[in-house]
Design a protein with these regions (language model features):
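ABC family nucleotide-binding domain
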Residues: 4-152, 159
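Conserved beta-strand-loop-alpha-helix hinge in the C-terminal portion
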Residues: 163-186
């Protein structure tokens, strides 16, 4: 269903982008973190992460540098030469996250990004996403049932039966204070 209002991403109204140009826009401006990874089994972890940069014809040295930097941040550097079927679910999720973040997108759409991760990997991913939000002014739209994950967000919408029933702006509240508030509100 189309929206009557303009939807702006990176100062561009996406409702006016022609179908033939939308794939390029999406590849350059959006990052997707899926609950079920969506990795290509015939590519290594490194190739999965770098795919959008390769398609955009980035410099190979720049690609390698960026892949290694994001892999280091997410603790997956040691599995870059492996294939998705050779690694754990948590490692696949971190690979999927690296792939979404590699292009430094202006909008990241994340569906339960920490669902398959242990607490350490979850914290690493959420801190990386918060860092990207601050440094690159990227907007992150995250679906989660986890108050810990939501505590990294500045604005939280609570949905019930498809409708917003509450909203919290964290503002200057600490993540710990937010966790207490979110327990009461939800």
């Amino acid at each position: 269903q189309t929206c009557a209002l303009p939807i702006s991403v990176n100062n561009q109204d996406i409702t006016k982008i022609k179908d033939k140009d939308f794939a390029d826009f999406r590849r350059e401006n959006l990052g997707f973190i899926f609950q079920d990874f969506n990795l290509l089994d015939t590519l290594t972890i490194e190739e999965n992460i770098s795919l959008s940069l390769v398609i955009n014809k980035r410099n190979p040295a720049d690609i390698e540098k960026r892949v290694h930097a994001i892999a280091d941040k997410l603790g997956i550097r040691d599995i870059l030469s492996k294939f998705p079927y050779e690694v754990s679910g948590g490692q696949k999720q971190r690979c999927a996250c690296a792939r979404a973040l590699i292009n430094e997108p202006k909008l990241i759409l994340a569906d339960e990004p920490t669902g398959a991760l242990d607490s350490k990997a979850s914290r690493l991913l959420l801190e990386t996403m918060a860092d990207i939000n601050k440094k690159m002014q990227a907007t992150i739209l995250m679906v989660t049932h986890d108050p810990f994950s939501a505590s990294f967000c500045e604005r939280i919408l609570f949905l019930k039966d498809g409708k917003i029933f509450n909203e919290i702006f964290r503002g200057e509240k600490s993540r710990k204070d937010f966790l207490l508030i979110s327990d009461i509100v939800s």
